[in-house]
């Protein structure tokens, strides 16, 4: 006897069960953009996006010598999911071919920690080591960035630095950051020091590139944030895959995945729920608050937009980054206004491009539009 169909088996007044839009076999419980899908199809979609992006990084290099790549691990959803996905992919590679195309150097940077916090951080890092043992791991304190060479401290508004003869401490870092006048300035200096320390660690450990866990949503946030701060010239390496001015590659393997999709992944698939540290969801942020940063406002904006309009988020990150990556770099070198041509339209300046991208065709699932 044939199994009863959904309509016949449902109770009076009960809504019909929706099937997965991809396999049409299993009940849909999760979302990909605006599609309702089952867990299996969701997992396949997310993993495929990250792995396909990683495959584009290999280029023409010899596959016999694995690339060494640094993966910054914050214990948050994005970096944890990236590590989980790449660990699984490398395991399959090794099983099939007895070799891997790249090896991961996983680095955790502690921000402001006392001894007790540092012990808790080390214990959590050990959990990741136990779960994903094929990789090498290391941790550093952000205060170590205070003794890096080649940073223009004066341009950052910092003068009271520890001497080279004195070992920097987390207290020194807190003192410097708290001396800055605005919340945005404080967030900026932490972000700058974090990136410069990661670059230094990557170079000292012979890594070719850094794998950042930035999602489509995060890249869209950075695009508007850096533009608002007058730093549009930095977008080619802040949102696009490729070389950075620091002599090492910046890569974004999760660039085709929305933040809300990563959040779902991190809470739905073992062992991530036991490993990931989730930040408390932000309450409504007031633009007039002294503790509010530009980054906070952009994050709040895109968090509300991606829920119902994922194409807007994708268009900002995908279309803008793709067109900007080459021309903005050349423009910034000669100090001219950034202008580019889009779809045969008249030239548009940096800000105009952003709003054009928001109103463009839906590129959120268009593979041909990916940079």
UniProtKB/Swiss-Prot annotation:
Localization (cell): Cytoplasm
UniProtKB keywords: Cytoplasm, tRNA processing
GO biological process: one example: tRNA wobble position uridine thiolation
A Gene Ontology molecular function term of the record: sulfurtransferase activity
SUPFAM superfamilies for the chain: Adenine nucleotide alpha hydrolases-like
GO CC entries: cytosol
Main subcellular location of this protein, as a coarse class: cytoplasm
Protein task: Plays a central role in 2-thiolation of mcm(5)S(2)U at tRNA wobble positions of tRNA(Lys), tRNA(Glu) and tRNA(Gln). May act by forming a heterodimer with ncs6 that ligates sulfur from thiocarboxylated urm1 onto the uridine of tRNAs at wobble position. Prior mcm(5) tRNA modification by the elongator complex is required for 2-thiolation. May also be involved in protein urmylation.
Family recorded in the similarity comment: Belongs to the CTU2/NCS2 family.
Name of the molecule in the record: Cytoplasmic tRNA 2-thiolation protein 2
